């Protein structure tokens, strides 16, 4: 009985110590994803949630832009929320390639990084859904909506990598 009482007292003391750390903000237990520190992005990249974003100023085709992003450790940017869309808008001084494409099947838009396309910001009459225009760009229009363009066009691009 004495042993059980000692164990209970020890557990209460440890629980109290951990509660004190939480109240003081010194607890080391991992918190939810939204409370994680931003990733340490490579030079030239900017943190956005659990990802790093890079604005590539050299104009190139969609395929070369994707290859370039992969060489840098990422993909052309996928966009999953209005927050991400707005952030990328702040980087964009004109038309840029982002990671959407429908080149395998007209109208079947996917992100090059394989993530689900759960957010959309198409321009009002887009996409055209023709294979000749199967790569996605963010326009230079006021709302910087998405448009489908022929992939051989040369534009700047936005890369993203996840940590």
From Swiss-Prot:
Keywords: Antifreeze protein, Disulfide bond, Lectin, Secreted, Signal. The keyword Disulfide bond applies. GO terms for molecular function: carbohydrate binding. GO terms for cellular component: extracellular region. The N-terminus is blocked. Antifreeze proteins lower the blood freezing point. This is Type-2 ice-structuring protein. It comes from Hemitripterus americanus (Sea raven).
């Amino acid at each position: 009985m004495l042993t059980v009482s000692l164990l209970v007292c020890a557990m209460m003391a440890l629980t109290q110590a951990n509660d004190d750390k939480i109240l003081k903000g010194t607890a080391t237990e991992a918190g939810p994803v939204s409370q994680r520190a931003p990733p340490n992005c490579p030079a030239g990249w900017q943190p956005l949630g659990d990802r790093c974003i890079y604005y590539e100023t050299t104009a190139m085709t969609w395929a070369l832009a994707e290859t370039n992003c992969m060489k840098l450790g990422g993909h052309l940017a996928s966009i999953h929320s209005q927050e991400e869309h707005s952030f990328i808008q702040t980087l964009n001084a004109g038309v840029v390639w982002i990671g959407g494409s429908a080149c395998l099947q007209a109208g079947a838009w996917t992100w090059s990084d394989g993530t689900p396309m759960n957010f959309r910001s198409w321009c009002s009459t887009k996409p055209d859904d023709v294979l000749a225009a199967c790569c996605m760009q963010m326009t230079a229009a006021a709302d910087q909506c998405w448009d489908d363009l022929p992939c051989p066009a040369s534009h700047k691009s936005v890369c993203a990598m996840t940590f």
